[in-house]
Curated annotation (Swiss-Prot):
Pfam families: UPAR_LY6. Its main location: secreted. This is Lymphocyte antigen 6K. The keyword Lipoprotein applies. The keyword NADP does not apply. GO terms for cellular component: acrosomal vesicle; cell surface; cytoplasm; extracellular region; membrane raft; plasma membrane; side of membrane. Residues 1-20 form the signal peptide. It is found in: Secreted; Cytoplasm; Cell membrane; Cytoplasmic vesicle, Secretory vesicle, Acrosome.
Amino acid sequence: MAFLVALLVVLGLQLVQSNALTCHVCEAQNSYACSNPSQCPGEKKFCLLAVTRIFERFFYVSKQCTRRCPTPVVSPPSTNPPSEPKEFLIEKPMPFLFYKCCQWDSCNGEGPPTDQLLKEQPGKASGRRHRYIELLLTGFMVLTANGLSALCLL
């Protein structure tokens, strides 16, 4: 009898639906293509997609599960007319380019709806003003610091 009850409990546990949220948990550089669907722990109720600018033409994408959402949550798609998305595209001087918080399975899989983050900069990259002298002096100091400190000149 105890065996039968244990068997029913084990089989019944498989029928219980999990309320855990599934989010993509990954990080990538210059691409939104990373995907790693993972079940979030019970206390983490939101999926997050954050894009941060590191350099002018280099950005970092992070997809995570999170406990809190500091921005308004994006609603799941439905058959009703869709509401305006609550995604944020942030311009200078902030390092965050795009931020999305949502609460349905795998909702943080895609990046912004347009390629606004990848605006081409006017002019050629080689035509921009560079400070080669500062780079040269910094490199010179790094290369000669050991020798100068040995001579007690630095």
